[in-house]
Amino acid sequence: EEMTTIITDLKETFRRGNIYIQLIYINVAVFILTTLTEVMFQLFNRSIAGVFEWLELPASVIRFILQPWSLLTYMFMHAGFMHILFNMLWLYWFGALFLSFFSAKHLRGVYILGGICGGLLYMAAYNIFPYFRPMTDYSFMLGASASVLAIVAATSYREPNYPIRLLLFGTIRLKYLALIVIGTDLLFITSSNAGGHIAHLGGALAGVWFAASLSKGSDLTSWINKCLDTLVSIVNFKPRKPKMKVHYGTGKQKDYDYNARKKAQSDEIDRILDKLKKSGYESLTTEEKKSLFDASKR
């Protein structure tokens, strides 16, 4: 019963939460589920890493053709506790700031758009540059970093001079924070986490592209939100209950009842009229007078 209450509370918090809170919930839920599954398999000396690769984004184009859904699923997967912790902290801080200037639907759209653009740039780089080619066949990417960087970049483009307080460095303008993050990714593009840094750049470009296009009246996330709305409506579909109850097969019985009732009423009126002729109006009872009056109105 206690567990049921906890699950109910979590569902209610998710339902009432802002979009960035909902995205954090989804990421954390996926992380817990995949981690618990991995632990269970390890207890029996089994590895499930190969299964999870089908949810991660491969650098190999041939492998990607076999698992195209990974362009969406990879942005909800994480490699460890610190990986998801920092991504979710950034999503929490900048998700709230993003909503000061854009809508909730824009945020979920930019999250997906940033992840897609980051993933595509990662695949392109690994298949174009000779430096990455030896790693292409066995490289996989996962994490929400590109999606989060898209949110940071879009907010930075919209409000470049917004003051951000940093614990050790004091207050700096948002545009400088974004430039530091992007600059770091450029410097470490050939590091051991090359795919992640490339994806960050793709996400950041997507965020700037979105904000710049929106300022000119074009919403790059509209198609994403249409797809998501359709998906949500399918998941939440409930057949509409009929407003009226319809009964079949009883028509003859109902006609018979109706006709019998009409005949009884007619016989009663005939009896009252006969009494009226013989003994006059005053001889009728109150009930008979009422029946006669009702019949005259039909």
Map each language-model feature to its residues.
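Terminal membrane-proximal soluble interaction domains of membrane-associated proteins
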Residues: 263-298
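A detector for small-residue-rich transmembrane helices and their helix-helix packing motifs
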Residues: 1-264, 268, 272
